[in-house]
Structures are given as C-alpha cells and as structure tokens.
C-alpha cells in the first residue's frame, strides 16, 4: 500500500486511465459476444467471412479501430465510433472514480475527512485509505458489469444472464472475502461526559445498520440461504399459462422447468452456495458473515422489489413493463452495495426514465424504455454521492419494521398511478 501512496496522484490517474481504456476493449468484446445477436465487431473476435484477417495492431486500444474502418462495408458506416468512444469513456470513468473515492475521499463525510487530516491520525488515515482502495476496486468491477449490461440493453432491449449471474457471484464473493468492499459507514462516539469526539469508527454498511432488528446467528443463516435460493429459483425458466386451467398450467410449468438444462445448473449452484454460506457462517463468521449476509439481502431486496413492480406494472399496463433482465441487474447491484442503496437507486432511476418515456410518447417513437441504463446511472450516482445520501437517509433506515410496511404501501399506491400514466400515454398517442 505504501508504494501506491508514494506514487503521485496524477501518475496513478494516468495509469488507471490507460488501464481503463484497455479494459474498455474487453467490455466491447463482452457487449458483442454476450448479446443475443452476436456480432464480430470486436478485434478480439474472428473476422467475418470475406473480411481481411485481423491484425495484431487492430487489437491496440483506440488506434486499432482506425484500422478496422476497412470493415465498414460489413458492419455499417461509422460502426467503429461507438466502441472507440466506449474505450475512452471507460478509461475516463475509472480514473474519475479513483480521483473521487481515493484522491478526494468523496465517500467519507466531511467531518471524518477533517478528523483524519489532524496531526497524529496518520495511522487511522492510512487504514482508511486501504479500505477506500478496496471499495474502489469493487465499484470499478461493478461499473464494468453495468457498462456491458447497459449497452446490450440499448442494443437489444434485454440484459443477458451471462452478464448478471457472474456479476452477482463476484459481488457476493467480494462481500465475503473483503467486507470493506461494501459502501462505507462512519460513526462518531462521544467522549467522556458527552464532551468531544472519540476516534471515529470507519466500517461498512451492514444488513441491520441503523435498523433495530434483532437477528440471531442461526436465524441469519436461514435468511441468507433463503435469499440465495430466491435468486436461484428466480433465474429458472418459468412458463405459466392459465388458458386451460390451473392443473394444466402447473403441469406445463413443471415440465418446462424440468426440460430446461439451466434448471440443473441452478440447483447445483444453490446447493454449492448453501454449503459455502454454512462454511462462512460457522468458520469465518464476524465481519465476513456480516458482509456476505448484507450482500445476499441486498441481492434479494434489489431483485425482489424490481420483480414485484414488474409483475404489478405488467398486469395494469397490459404489456411487459420491464424485462426480467432489469430484475437480475438490480440483484447484481444489490450484491455489491447492499439493500439500503438499492432502495435509493430504485427511487432515483424513474426520474430519468419518466422524462425519456414522455418524450418518446410525444414524438410517437418506440414506447418501450430501456430501463437498465437508468438503473445503472442511478447506481453510479448513489455510489458517488453516498456520503450525502447516507447522511440524509440514515434516520429513515432506522425505522426498522416500518420500512417494509412503507414499501408495501408504496406498491399499493403504484397501481392507481400506473393507471393514470397509461391514460396519459394513450392520450398522447391519440388512442
């Protein structure tokens, strides 16, 4: 860690910018290879029949795309502009994220930053910087997955499991191995007689942070296993048709579930995951279990809340309100950040989506909104402004069991609001 801190900040930023550009090349590969309609645009893919073989120089970040312009007849004029811009964007985002999280310590409250800058607090400052670097690595990893998911969603209106399943598993693994990868929480304890401030405690956000919930050790294990299996079952292929009655619907549902080869792998994943949870709970415990449990609950609430909204909105609007990829995307984000940030993200994302939806309704364009990019943008805003967001929302998360009750009321109110939105949309389209 010392050699990193001894390196000037601008050198670190320049190195991360170049690393981000290189990473952007592989994100381009993921965008074109993981999509439903795969395309051989990335220089790391095989060239299409009739195209000249790919050269080594074609795989150089940025400059390689100028050589690949020769394939414009196959992929369309200017096809190379977006992947080149994405490499630049990835480099800029990685460097900017490091500057904000590490250079400016932007995820920490001002009071803590001032405390760490006081003479005699060098040890605490170095420990905080080590934690911040772990957080940055986790957030950079999440950013990479969100970029791939967003661009595939923009292209195809879908988010493949090939992006969100590995992303979710990596988020869970990071939370268990390095709980500091979760968003930070700083608390100040009062000194003797309530005067002055003792040394601050910099920790990570936990499942029960600020909430008065008493979860015993064994009950927390049951909760974690339940969250894992909810995710696994949610990923299974489900076909439910009631046209021929409940019995036929159930028979077809089970038959399709058993025929799908993905079901077997998800069951295996659930069993192995359960064994892993038991190991972490009984043998590692402490912060490792708290971190993993926080990620599991974040995964379940992030994905589960989106799933419920999808079901309700689809029933009211009479068409699919959002794809199931949005559900798995929010589960992945929850695994990296926890459930409290997921609620913030869930309420931030619609603002941009509603504005775009109204504009599309007025211009009679495609009424379907790619919601995934808005979820990712809201997640990025939540990460960057976390210190301010937590300062303002922490008292709300201390309400304990009033939180799920409030969410239930919001879901009940969503029905009438969606009916109003459907009426406005139909009127704008002249229906």
Predicted features and spans:
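A membrane-topology feature that recognizes alpha-helical transmembrane segments
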Residues: 1-431
């Amino acid at each position: 860690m010392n050699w990193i801190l001894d390196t000037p900040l601008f050198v670190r930023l320049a190195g991360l910018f170049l690393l981000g550009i290189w990473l952007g090349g592989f994100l381009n590969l993921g965008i074109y290879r993981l999509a439903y309609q795969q395309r051989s645009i990335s220089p790391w893919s095989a060239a299409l029949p009739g195209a000249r073989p790919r050269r080594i120089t074609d795989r150089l970040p940025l400059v390689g795309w100028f050589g690949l312009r020769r394939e414009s007849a196959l992929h369309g004029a200017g096809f190379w502009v977006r992947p080149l811009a994405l490499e630049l964007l990835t480099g800029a985002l990685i460097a900017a994220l490091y500057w904000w999280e590490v250079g400016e310590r932007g995820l920490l409250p001002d009071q803590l930053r001032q405390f760490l800058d006081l003479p005699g607090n060098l040890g605490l400052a170095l420990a905080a910087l080590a934690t911040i670097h772990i957080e940055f690595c986790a957030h950079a990893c999440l950013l990479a997955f969100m970029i791939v998911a967003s661009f595939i969603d923009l292209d195809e209106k879908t988010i493949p499991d090939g992006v969100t399943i590995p992303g979710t598993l990596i988020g869970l693994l990071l939370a268990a191995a390095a709980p500091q990868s979760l968003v930070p929480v700083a608390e100040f304890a009062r000194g003797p007689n309530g005067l002055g401030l003792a040394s601050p405690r910099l920790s990570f956000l936990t499942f029960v942070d600020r909430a008065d919930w008493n979860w015993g050790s064994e009950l927390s294990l049951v909760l974690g296993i339940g969250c894992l299996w909810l995710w696994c079952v949610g990923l299974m292929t489900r076909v439910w048709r009631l046209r021929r009655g409940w019995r036929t619907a159930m028979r077809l549902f089970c038959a399709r579930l058993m025929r799908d080869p993905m079901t077997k792998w998800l069951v295996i994943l659930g069993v192995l995951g359960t064994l892993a949870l038991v190991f972490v709970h009984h043998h590692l415990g402490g912060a490792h279990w708290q971190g993993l449990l926080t990620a599991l609950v974040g995964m379940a609430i992030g994905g589960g809340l989106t799933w419920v909204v999808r079901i309700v909105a689809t029933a009211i609007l009479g068409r699919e309100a959002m794809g199931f990829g949005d559900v798995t995307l929010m589960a992945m984000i929850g695994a990296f950040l926890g459930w409290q940030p997921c609620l913030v993200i869930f309420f931030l994302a619609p603002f941009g989506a509603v504005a775009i939806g109204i504009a599309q309704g007025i211009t009679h364009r495609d009424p379907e909104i790619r919601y995934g990019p808005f979820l990712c943008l809201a997640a990025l805003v939540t990460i960057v402004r976390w210190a301010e967001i937590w300062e303002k929302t922490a008292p709300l998360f201390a309400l304990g069991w009033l939180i799920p009750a409030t969410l239930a009321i919001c879901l009940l109110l969503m029905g009438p609001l969606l009916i109003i939105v459907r009426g406005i949309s139909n009127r704008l389209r002249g229906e």
